[in-house]
């Protein structure tokens, strides 16, 4: 026996068939209490529901069930007060809670695990925890969407450049750009709600994998824990973590949207763009350059997204080769989800704060909107509507006019009518009406377009939805 071995199993929950205790290294790799103690509230909620059901069905004496329920509340209060004696030797939150319950109420604590396994217990705890996080994500997304709506409403008719390839494309409005993110985060909100609805089935009572011979009432515990129904197949209930993967997938898509917006805020707040000014509350300075005001919140959001993507991939890799039902590999599911949830909630809160506090520079936006031949498409459309040119010919004529303006180092509205007629003789003076950026955005009245009237309709629709 090595120095790291224990002479007898230190775990009284499952050690009956073992002659020797686990090696200290085995205890270290096997223990999850360092992270799964975050599920203490969920574990105790599940155990209290199970205890109440055991008493109601007569599987245990009602007095024992009551003692278990009250004792579990005492355990919860100790954990919340920060003076609970967590033990690595007891491996996880489930055994730590049960061991402490036995110290408090004695022999009845040993009846709590009747008709239950750690397999369905941990699946229940984890589902409850993920469900709580989905609710928190929903609240965070709603706050961000409302902040974006406020920005969109304030600048519904402020002209700015729209980009493709980060090159000037067409004029749009600030409100239209903000509403694009409202739509993206709105779909994230829908995915969060869908994921919550799909996962809301209770694993409790599935036991190890095959169910139990005790006359338990799974519908009772499901209802007590706020689930819509018990999971229909006990083997599936303890085997899969697709609810956690769906959370991570949903979080990854939302994080991607946050990262794209963060990237734009980094660019827009630079001295080269000056589209927005971020508040001091969400910026930092430099230790050597006194003039610096850095968009660190946006940059950190952009970086944290990688951790969320990584968590999704990591859990996929854990689950991809596991036969049914439970394997110890699945203990590695929680840290990924915990970290992703923490970083997503922090990123949502930081983005909401930045959006709420940032100030758009209307003058810089308008000036940039008129550069880069942004109304070239309006010119091509005018050639089609007024002169009857096929669009491909209009596209070619407009390209030639852009080349002429570039050669003259001017923008399209600065060309003379004579310049334009040199490219196409049919052009009339009315063409200048479509070359202004204000007229350009006002003309985009198709459903979902950038015209202020359409932007305000979009805002009103979202206000009503929320």
Swiss-Prot record:
PANTHER family: ARGININOSUCCINATE LYASE. SUPFAM superfamilies: L-aspartase-like (SSF48557). InterPro entries: Arg_succ_lyase_C, Argininosuccinate_lyase, Fumarase/histidase_N, Fumarate_lyase_CS, Fumarate_lyase_fam, Fumarate_lyase_N, L-Aspartase-like. Its EC number is 4.3.2.1. Pathway: Amino-acid biosynthesis; L-arginine biosynthesis; L-arginine from L-ornithine and carbamoyl phosphate: step 3/3. It comes from the Bacteria. Its main location: cytoplasm. It comes from Roseobacter denitrificans (strain ATCC 33942 / OCh 114). The lineage of its organism: Bacteria, Pseudomonadati, Pseudomonadota, Alphaproteobacteria, Rhodobacterales. This is Argininosuccinate lyase. It catalyses: 2-(N(omega)-L-arginino)succinate = fumarate + L-arginine. Keywords: Amino-acid biosynthesis, Arginine biosynthesis, Cytoplasm, Lyase. The gene is argH. GO terms for cellular component: cytosol. CDD domains: Argininosuccinate_lyase. Disulfide bonds: none annotated. It is found in: Cytoplasm. GO terms for molecular function: argininosuccinate lyase activity. Coiled coil: none annotated. Belongs to the lyase 1 family. Argininosuccinate lyase subfamily. One of its GO terms (biological process) is L-arginine biosynthetic process.
């Amino acid at each position: 026996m090595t120095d790291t071995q224990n002479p007898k199993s230190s775990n009284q929950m499952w050690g009956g068939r073992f002659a020797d205790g686990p090696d200290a290294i085995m205890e270290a790799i096997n223990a999850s209490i360092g992270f799964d103690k975050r599920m203490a509230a969920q574990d105790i909620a599940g155990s209290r529901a199970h205890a109440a059901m055991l008493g109601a069905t007569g599987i245990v004496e009602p007095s024992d069930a009551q003692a278990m329920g009250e004792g579990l509340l005492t355990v919860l209060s100790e954990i919340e007060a920060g003076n609970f004696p967590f033990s690595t030797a007891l491996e996880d939150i489930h055994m730590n809670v049960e061991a402490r319950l036995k110290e408090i109420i004695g022999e009845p604590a040993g009846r709590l695990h009747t008709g239950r396994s750690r397999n369905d217990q941990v699946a229940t705890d984890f589902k409850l925890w993920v469900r709580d996080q989905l609710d928190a994500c929903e609240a965070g997304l709603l706050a961000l969407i409302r902040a974006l709506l406020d920005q969109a409403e304030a600048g519904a008719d402020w002209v700015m450049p729209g980009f493709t390839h980060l090159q000037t494309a067409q004029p749009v409005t600030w409100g239209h750009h903000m509403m694009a993110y409202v739509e993206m985060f709105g779909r994230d909100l829908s995915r969060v709600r869908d994921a919550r609805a799909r996962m809301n089935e209770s694993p409790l009572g599935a036991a190890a994998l095959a169910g139990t011979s005790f006359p338990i009432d799974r519908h009772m515990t499901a209802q007590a824990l706020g689930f819509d129904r018990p999971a229909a197949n006990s083997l599936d209930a303890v085997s899969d973590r697709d609810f956690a993967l769906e959370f991570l997938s949903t979080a990854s898509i939302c994080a991607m949207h946050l990262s794209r917006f963060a990237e734009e805020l980094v660019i827009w707040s630079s001295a080269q763009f000056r589209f927005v000014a971020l508040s001091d509350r969400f910026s930092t300075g430099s230790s050597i350059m006194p003039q610096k005001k850095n968009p660190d919140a946006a940059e950190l959001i952009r970086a944290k997204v990688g951790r969320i993507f990584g968590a999704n991939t990591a859990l996929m890799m854990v689950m991809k080769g596991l036969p049914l039902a439970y394997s110890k590999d699945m203990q590695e599911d929680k840290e990924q989800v915990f970290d992703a949830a923490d970083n997503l909630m922090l990123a949502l809160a930081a983005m909401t704060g930045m959006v709420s506090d940032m100030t758009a520079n209307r003058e810089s936006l308008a000036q940039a909107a008129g550069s880069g031949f942004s109304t070239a498409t309006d010119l091509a459309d005018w050639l089609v509507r007024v002169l009857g040119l096929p669009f491909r010919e209009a596209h070619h004529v407009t390209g030639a006019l852009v080349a002429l303006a570039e050669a003259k180092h001017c923008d399209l509205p600065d060309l003379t009518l004579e310049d334009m007629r040199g490219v196409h003789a049919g052009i009339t003076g009315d063409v200048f009406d479509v070359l202004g950026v204000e007229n350009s955005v006002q003309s985009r009245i198709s459903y979902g377009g950038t015209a202020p009237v359409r932007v305000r309709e979009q805002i009103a629709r979202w206000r009503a939805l929320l």
